[in-house]
Regions:
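Phosphate/pyrophosphate-binding loops at sites that engage ATP/ADP/AMP, CoA/4′-phosphopantetheine
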Residues: 9-21, 163-169
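Glycine-rich and small/hydrophobic secondary-structure elements
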Residues: 31-84, 140-165
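Single conserved hydrophobic/aromatic residue that forms the stacking wall/gate
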Residues: 1-7, 11
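Beta-strand segments within the central parallel beta-sheet cores of soluble alpha/beta enzyme folds
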Residues: 17-25, 52-62, 89-94, 123, ...
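Short, hydrophobic/aliphatic alpha-helical segments
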Residues: 13-25, 131-138
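Glycine-rich loop/linker segments at domain edges
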Residues: 73-158
Length: 172
């Protein structure tokens, strides 16, 4: 059985040594090749078993973009306590991530968002909670930054709001 994916094992329980996987190239952005190729792999495997021939799947870019996940959108609610000089004293935040219909890599991604939520700043008192949410959307996945940018945006937003409140420049 020749296919472009080891997923062919799922249909006929072929031993792995009977499955030939051929991949011409794996270029492009980080993340989509970790788990998001499963949909295409299963289709190729089923078609290969059904026809007894090798199968090539090449979705056009529009279909690929519709069917595969993107960066996790986050909704972040937070409270921050700070001194008159702008020094942050406490941060309490809930980071909710739209994970889509499956967990995929959402756990590590939401964890990494937490780890980067202070960016380069120091919070002497902090409570950060991540909430991965299952929704009816396409499952989101690993993307360049792997949750880090979402966490850093929290820190930068806090700095912006403190500066605005104190009528100062964010660089002060």
């Amino acid at each position: 059985l020749a296919t472009s994916s080891a997923a062919s094992d799922v249909y006929k329980r072929q031993p792995f040594n009977k499955v030939i996987v051929k991949v011409k190239r794996m270029g492009g952005g980080f993340g989509g090749k970790e788990t998001q190729s499963n949909l295409f792999a299963v289709v190729a495997a089923l078609a290969s078993v059904r026809t007894g021939k090798s199968v090539k799947i090449r979705p056009d870019r529009d279909d690929d973009m519709i069917m595969t996940g993107k960066r996790h959108p986050f909704y972040i609610k937070y409270n921050v306590g700070f001194e008159k000089n702008g020094q942050i004293m406490a941060v309490d935040a809930l980071l909710s991530a739209n994970c889509g219909f499956s967990s995929d890599l959402s756990g590590p991604i939401t964890d990494r968002a937490l780890f980067h939520s202070d960016n380069c700043y120091f919070y002497p008192n902090v409570r950060l909670i991540s909430r991965p949410l299952r929704t009816n959307k396409v499952s989101n996945t690993a993307f360049r930054g792997f949750g880090g940018p979402q966490g850093m945006m929290l820190a930068e937003r806090i700095i912006q709001e403190i500066a605005f409140f104190l009528k100062k420049d964010t660089l002060e």
